Amino acid sequence: MLAAKNILNRSSLSSSFRIATRLQSTKVQGSVIGIDLGTTNSAVAIMEGKVPKIIENAEGSRTTPSVVAFTKEGERLVGIPAKRQAVVNPENTLFATKRLIGRRFEDAEVQRDIKQVPYKIVKHSNGDAWVEARGQTYSPAQIGGFVLNKMKETAEAYLGKPVKNAVVTVPAYFNDSQRQATKDAGQIVGLNVLRVVNEPTAAALAYGLEKSDSKVVAVFDLGGGTFDISILDIDNGVFEVKSTNGDTHLGGEDFDIYLLREIVSRFKTETGIDLENDRMAIQRIREAAEKAKIELSSTVSTEINLPFITADASGPKHINMKFSRAQFETLTAPLVKRTVDPVKKALKDAGLSTSDISEVLLVGGMSRMPKVVETVKSLFGKDPSKAVNPDEAVAIGAAVQGAVLSGEVTDVLLLDVTPLSLGIETLGGVFTRLIPRNTTIPTKKSQIFSTAAAGQTSVEIRVFQGERELVRDNKLIGNFTLAGIPPAPKGVPQIEVTFDIDADGIINVSARDKATNKDSSITVAGSSGLSENEIEQMVNDAEKFKSQDEARKQAIETANKADQLANDTENSLKEFEGKVDKAEAQKVRDQITSLKELVARVQGGEEVNAEELKTKTEELQTSSMKLFEQLYKNDSNNNNNNNGNNAESGETKQ
C-alpha cells in the first residue's frame, strides 16, 4: 500500500485506510496541460480554444525521450541530451523506469528487468523497486517526476507563464499503487495532477472530439512498455468505457530486447566473444536494435553496422548483420501473440463481438509494426483506422480532459472504468470481490462482514486487486486493522467495509463496526509507495537541480543564437568573397569554426561553460561587424572615386 495519513473518527468505532490520501483539489486556475508520460517517449499538449496542440521541446521535437542521466560533474540531463550520451554513460542513464513504477522489488517483472538494463535496480527499505545512479538512489516516481518537469518547462516556454495544473496519462491496466506513484511523480516537481486518465481513453478523446455520430471504438495501444485494449462507446461527446484489458509489461522495449539478444547470440557464435557483461557494447547494440526495429516497419530489410564493438588478441571486432522484416517478425512473434488474449477478454467483458466495433484506433509507436497491424486486422476483421497520430493522440486527449476540467470544453463527458477487480481477504485466503473489473468510476460499494473467531476484538482488513480466486495470486495494495470490537460469538459483529473509487481510479477503503460507538484504534501497515516525508525530500532535491536546469536551458538558448550568428556570418562571407580582406576573413572563419564546435557540444548534451560560449559569440559578432564595416567603407570610397572620375571627364568635354 501507499504510506498514507489515516484519520480516526473517535465518535464511532470506525477506521479508515486511504490508500491514496494525497488527492489534489480539482479547482483550476490557469492553463491545464496534458502530459503523456510514456515508457520510451513523452509528450505535452495544450488546448488553444477548441483546438489541441502538441508543444515542441527546446530541441524542436514533438516528443521527448523519457530518459534521465546523471553526469560525472553531477549534472542531471533529461530527454534528448540524456539519450545522446547513453553509450558512454550506460550505468547512470535511466530509461524505461515507468516499468518499475509502483512495483515491488520481488515482482517477477522487476527481476526480469534487472538482467536487461545497464543501470542498477535496488530494493528500497519499504520493499519497492528503486534505481541507483552515481551512488544515489531514486524512486521510479522521482525519475518520472524529472521527465514531467521537462514537459512542464516545455509548456511554460511556449505559454510564457508558469504552469501548475496537469492531466497525466497512465496505462489503463495500471493498478492502484502505480496510479498513485504517477500522481506522486507530479507532486515531486510541483505539478497539481488534477486527473489521471487511462492512455487508450485519452486517445479516444483525441479521436472523438468534434464528432457527433455514435460509434463503438476499440483502442489498441501498444507503446514502449505497456499494452492496453479499451472498448468505448462514443456518442455525441459522451465517452463511455465499456471494458479494458492489457499487459503492463509488454511493449517496444521487449521487441528491442528480443533483437538485442539475437545480435549478441549471433556475435558469440561468429567470434566466440560474449558481450553480455560489456555495458557500453550492450547499450550500443540496444540503440542499433531500436533503430533497426523502426526501419523494419517501413523497409523489408535493414543492416546493423557497429564498428569496434570489442577487441581480442587478434584485433578489433565489428558487428555487421542483416535482418529482414520476416526474420524480425518470426523472432518477436511471441510478443505480438501476447496482445491477442487481452483483446478477446475486453470484447467478452464488454458483451460485444468484433462486428459491433465501428473503428479500431492504433496508438503507441509499436502499433506501426506491419505484423501488429496485420494481427489487429485479423482480430477485428477490418483495417484499423489511421485517424490519430500514434505518438501524439494520448497527450492530445489529456489536454482535452484538462480543458474539460478547466471549463474551456463543456460538451465532453468521460466515463472510465476500473481495470481490475477490488476486494478483501476473507477466511481461508479467499479473494472476496466488492467491485468487479470494468465498473464505471467514480463508484462506491459497501458489504457487511463479520469475525472469523469467537471473542475476536480486532480484524485486519487486507485489500487486494486482481482476478484470481485466492488472494495469494493477486496484488496486495493495502492493509489496516480495525480494533476495539467488543468480544462476541463468531459471526455476530457486523463490520461494514466500504470501497470508494474516485475519478482517477484511486481507492479509499473504510471499515466500521455497526453495533457500537466506542473509541477505536487503527494500525496501518504499508505495502508500497512513497511516504509524505520521502515526497517532501524529493521536492527539495528537485529544487536543488533547478539552478542547474536553468543554466542548461540558458546554455541551449545561447547556443541556438550563436549557431544562427555563425550561419549568417558564414553566408555573408561567401556572398562577399573577394571583396573583404583575406586575412581578416580567415580570422572570422576560424572564429566561426570554434563557435560551431562549442555549439555542437551544447546540442550534444555536454556541459559547456556559458561564459565561454557568450564570449566566443561576442568575439565573432565584433570581428564580423568590423569586417563588414570595412567592406562598406571600401564600397563607399570606390563609389566616391568613380563619381569624382566621372565629374572630371565631364569638365574636359565641356
From Swiss-Prot:
One of its GO terms (biological process) is protein unfolding. Transmembrane segments: none annotated. Keywords: ATP-binding, Chaperone, Hydrolase, Mitochondrion, Nucleotide-binding, Phosphoprotein, Stress response, Transit peptide. The keyword Ion transport does not apply. Pfam families: HSP70. It catalyses: ATP + H2O = ADP + phosphate + H(+). InterPro entries: ATPase_NBD, Chaperone_DnaK, Heat_shock_70_CS, HSP70_C_sf, HSP70_peptide-bd_sf, Hsp_70_fam. One of its GO terms (molecular function) is heat shock protein binding. The modification Phosphothreonine is found at residue 330. CDD domains: ASKHA_NBD_HSP70_Ssc1_3. Residues 629-654 are annotated as: Disordered. Residues 637-646 have a biased composition (Low complexity). Residues 1-23 form a transit peptide. GO terms for cellular component: cytoplasm; endodeoxyribonuclease complex; mitochondrial inner membrane; mitochondrial nucleoid; mitochondrion; PAM complex, Tim23 associated import motor; TIM23 mitochondrial import inner membrane translocase complex. It is found in: Mitochondrion matrix. It is an enzyme of class 3 (hydrolase). Its EC number is 3.6.4.10. Essential component of the PAM complex, a complex required for the translocation of transit peptide-containing proteins from the inner membrane into the mitochondrial matrix in an ATP-dependent manner. Constitutes the ATP-driven core of the motor and binds the precursor preprotein. Required for the import of the processed frataxin homolog YFH1 into the mitochondrion. Belongs to the heat shock protein 70 family. Component of the PAM complex, at least composed of SSC1 (mtHsp70), MGE1, TIM44, PAM16/TIM16, PAM17 and PAM18/TIM14. In the complex, SSC1 interacts directly with PAM18 and TIM44. Interacts with NAP1. This is Import motor subunit, mitochondrial.
